[in-house]
Structure formats: structure tokens, C-alpha cells
Amino acid sequence: MNVHKTRRQFLKQSAEAAALLAVAPMGSMYLSAAEPEAVWKAGIAKAVITPEKAVWLAGYGSKRPPDGKLHDLWMKALALEDATGKRVVLITSDFQGVPKGMSDLVFEQLQMQFRLERQQVMLTFSHNHCGPRLGDDLVDYYPVEAEQVELVAEYTAQMVTKLVAMVGEALANLAPAKLQIGEGKATFAVNRRNNKEAEVPALLAAGTPLTGPVDHTVPVMAVTRPNGDMAAILFGYACHPTTLS
């Protein structure tokens, strides 16, 4: 039976399996060190996913093509393998999300090429509201002309190929590593259902408490090599990040 985990559960359980021992304070964040005898391997890969053509952007209030580039968009993969050889892969990308048709193709290819089952792979997204549209995602929200339909389909196919290849690279890069988990705090997330956006800056400046539930915790996983070099830092945050308007 497939068991679907949340991102927080994935981060927590992946590192807790190493039988954590010590907790070292680090300001508002702590890291728990993994048991020395635990054998972990980690592999990392990344790829630029900035479109080379003017693919419609997803997440704006109206359909919109790109008008320039502030910086590249990225897709990254972290592969983990425990002492028994069990593998999991976490993939993050600068998309708003991916449609089911695309994710089905990705999972099919990962199973065929690397024998990764669905429960061994997690897709996460920066959900930046200014990345390219994929497949039939938001097709009812962003009706576009035939030329754009073709561009989006072409770009989506490229991303499936690039994502699968990137996972293969991460698996090929598996090497001994130490995992540590911790938790920090960041307070910029605001409950927008209970606080009017225009009033938030003044309320914060006045020290007036905002209302409504929020989650300001930042779960963190640090991946280091045996020589102490930092290989990767993985974190998550509960916030709806509309970065551009």
C-alpha cells in the first residue's frame, strides 16, 4: 500500500531513521547529529529550467508572457540512501506546481529507469507565481492561442526529460554523508485571511499582534560530507510566496 507523507514528515523521518543523539543549540535553530555508526549516502544534482522561448507564466492574475529575466529558475534533486540500500529522492523546482499528466510521466520514467516507486519520490515547488506554465495546468484559467499551447507542450516535454535525467545524476552522485535535522524560525508569514494586506506594515511597525493561525517554524536538514564540507541544506516554510505582481 502506498503511503503519502507530508514534506515535514518526509524531512523528519528521513533523518530520525539515523538514530539521532545530540542536540546542539544554534541561536533560534538547533541541529541534531546523526549516530556515527549510521551509514548514509547522499547525491545532489541541479538543472536550469529557465525557458528559452516565451512560454506563458503561471500565477499572475491574468495570462502573461515573460518580459525578461531577473535570474535563472532551477530544479534540484537530493537523493538519499540508507544502510539497507533503500532510496528516496526529493525534488524541488521553481514551478507553481505540475499537472497530474506530467507527474504521471515522470513517475513512470523514474520507475522504468531507476526502479523508484511512487512513495520513494517527492515533488516540491517554490510556488513563486511567476514561473512557466506546464501542460494543462490552469488551462481553464489561462486560455491561450494555439501557438502558446504548442510552446507549453514543448517546454513541458523538455522538463520531463530534464527532471528524469537530473534524478539519474543525483543517484549516480550518491556518496557517504551525515544528515542532521533542526528547526529554525522565520516570522514573515502572515495569515492573510485575518489581516488586511494594506494594514500589515503599520501593525508590525506599531508592534500590534497579528491575528490568525500561522506556522513560523522552519524545518531544516543539513547534509555534510565526511570531511565536514556542506553538501546541501534542505528546508521548508509554510507561506504562499507571490514574489512578483
Question: What residue spans do the PLM features occupy?
Answer:
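N-terminal export signals
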Residues: 11-31
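Short linear sequence motifs
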Residues: 2-3, 23, 148
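Twin-arginine (Tat) signal peptide motif
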Residues: 3-11
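Conserved beta-alpha junction segments in alpha/beta enzyme cores
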Residues: 35-124, 128-245
